């Protein structure tokens, strides 16, 4: 087949081209906010519209377009859906074996206040999981835990998506930062330093914001000491670790520091009023559980599924383990790489999105052993043995997990199909170039490019792979630091995670809100836009006023 070259301005006017390119995204927003369609229906129609735009407007060859849709769908199944299946399975094992009541009791013994439980589980534990695994696992696990603690499913999912803003940039052992360095040629350590000079401000803001969502101004007044301890310790550790150690460990270090500081603080301090969602009966049951006397051994045993999960995910994430499966590694043959027919290196990305015409690779990687989902499955198997769960119960639990997740898995597949057709057709790059045409105001809009990338792909890593080079080019054109705008792509990207269709589908799957994706999207969308504007203001100030903050 011939090499097809992307054309980012088919209409001959970048604004008109970007308007047509935005049709699938505008439809997706409209479908969830106004039409209130189920997630899988909205995603299916969005793929159809994106495919039509790619074929009719961008003149993408039919074979290339269909191949990108199929590639995206399978990428949604592996590795993304695999992570969700394994994570929900671990949670169900904990519930089925009766251990979750003990976990709930142990958290209630630290604090019965659900605002503070949100800080412990949603923020601290979620940030740790983001640092170790990323790619949807933290929201799935923490949202399920919070539902078990008595949170309403919509609130658990929505709050976890919003609070996940703080750690995403350094997620999965710093992969978003490392990828930004690879595609721009800028030292990834310096990018990490710059992100570490933007995100700590957002961390504090996000935690106060969460308290306001949960309990209004009263919530802020009653919990501010705990928020300052949790957010302040996290922000300081995030700044120090990113600026003096590197981009791989800020989430791991910051989350552990924050968890330790918050737990010790809550032994000395509790809010004057205990805040609980839901009815009085449920609260009374929880308070009874809080006073149930479990031994330290029982509590430790109950937490073992999540301790196993933490251990296996961390092991799978460390560089020596990853190196085994990399090219030239001892176990490289265990990774099955399948070049996608009719797509691999048959589409060329063109300047100014890249410095020179570059063939776009499309290789499906089936890393059956080294995938994060497999690490979580190992934790599940260890838990089954350790908790002496009957094999028949374990099999039926896994079966019910698959049955429950069938529709969400289809949704995730369609969402990734949309992301891939957007990328391979050049649709996403058209939107990026339109933003880059805003001149000196681009410092404000720069984070929106990262936001758009994460909305489209569900991943800060993928957003950086798509747009970091364009950010660097635009920065040079308007005379500001390329390091700053590449970092802004990463920092802005984290604010798009909470409305990314992939994240919405994952969160709904984890808390049993299948078909309610529109409710969750409406819950998070305004917060996402406000946070992106805040990052835009921070970036603009750093570009023109606080230039001393740039490394």
From Swiss-Prot:
Gene inactivation effect: The glcA-lldP double mutant is unable to grow on glycolate and displays undetectable glycolate uptake when grown in the presence of glycolate.
Protein keywords: Cell inner membrane, Cell membrane, Membrane, Symport, Transmembrane, Transmembrane helix, Transport
InterPro entries per the UniProt record, alphabetical: Lactate_perm (IPR003804)
Description of what induces expression: By L-lactate; aerobically.
GO CC field: plasma membrane
Keyword Metal-binding: no
Subcellular location: Cell inner membrane
Family membership noted in the UniProt record: Belongs to the lactate permease family.
Membrane topology: Multi-pass membrane protein
Sequence intervals crossing the membrane: 13-33, 37-57, 69-89, 131-151, 159-179, 194-214, 220-240, 244-264, 366-386, 405-425, 438-458, 494-514, 530-550
Known catalytic reactions: (S)-lactate(in) + H(+)(in) = (S)-lactate(out) + H(+)(out); (R)-lactate(in) + H(+)(in) = (R)-lactate(out) + H(+)(out); glycolate(in) + H(+)(in) = glycolate(out) + H(+)(out)
UniProt gene name: lldP
Main function: Uptake of L-lactate across the membrane. Can also transport D-lactate and glycolate. Seems to be driven by a proton motive force.
Protein name: L-lactate permease
Record-level GO BP terms: DNA damage response; lactate transmembrane transport
Main location: membrane
Regulation: Inhibited by the proton ionophore carbonyl cyanide m-chlorophenylhydrazone (CCCP).
